[in-house]
């Protein structure tokens, strides 16, 4: 059985092999290590690279008085990359990634808002890791207690469990080959 790190690395390898030219949003101020050729003011080619230091959740955990499931910290603390367009059982998913340390801080701010919303709604705490491409309101989330990967609508509870673990879910995701940068 693969570790989560091995599953993440294997997915990144499949992605690089199957999507030889990758595009992402260009944020000039970030000076991201993934950036390659700048296509235009909003678009850049990218190549994934390992984070020199994993995204640190300690301050957020302290502020929210909670611990995040280890799979969440591992997913967002391993690679810098553009978001990954994936196919999961015939459904296109955008798996969120961080492009740089600055983007990681932005992600932590967004996670904070999501957790506070869940608490206000008295729902189990989840962390979003992706979006359903068919509908922006459909989130791919990790249940913070169990680590299960599932689907939920914004503001609702997880309604469909896709996998009991992130590693198993990632092993079943395949790169979605895009035909051009505007796909």
Swiss-Prot record:
Membrane topology of this protein: Peripheral membrane protein
Cellular component terms per the entry's GO annotation: cytoplasmic side of plasma membrane
UniProt KW keywords: Cell inner membrane, Cell membrane, Membrane
Family annotation (InterPro entries): Syd (IPR009948), Syd_sf (IPR038228)
Cell compartment(s), UniProt: Cell inner membrane
Superkingdom in the source lineage: Bacteria
Family to which the UniProt record says this protein belongs: Belongs to the Syd family.
Function statement: Interacts with the SecY protein in vivo. May bind preferentially to an uncomplexed state of SecY, thus functioning either as a chelating agent for excess SecY in the cell or as a regulatory factor that negatively controls the translocase function.
Protein's recorded name: Protein Syd
Source organism of the structure: Idiomarina loihiensis (strain ATCC BAA-735 / DSM 15497 / L2-TR)
């Amino acid at each position: 059985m693969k570790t989560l790190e091995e599953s993440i690395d294997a997915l990144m390898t499949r992605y690089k092999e199957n999507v030889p030219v990758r595009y992402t949003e260009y944020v000039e101020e970030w000076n991201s290590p993934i950036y390659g050729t700048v296509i235009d003011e909003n678009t850049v080619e990218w190549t994934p690279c390992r984070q020199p230091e994993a995204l640190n959740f300690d301050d957020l955990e302290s502020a929210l008085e909670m611990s995040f499931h280890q799979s969440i910290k591992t997913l967002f603390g391993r690679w810098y990359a553009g978001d990954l367009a994936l196919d999961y059982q015939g459904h296109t998913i955008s798996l969120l990634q961080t492009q740089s340390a600055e983007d990681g801080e932005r992600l932590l701010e967004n996670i904070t808002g999501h957790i506070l919303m869940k608490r206000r709604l008295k729902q189990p705490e989840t962390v979003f890791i992706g979006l359903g491409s068919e509908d922006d309101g459909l989130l791919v989330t990790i249940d913070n207690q169990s680590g299960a990967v599932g689907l939920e609508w914004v503001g609702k509870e997880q309604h469909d469990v896709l996998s009991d673990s992130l590693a198993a879910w990632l092993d079943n995701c395949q790169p979605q080959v895009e035909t051009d940068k505007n796909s």
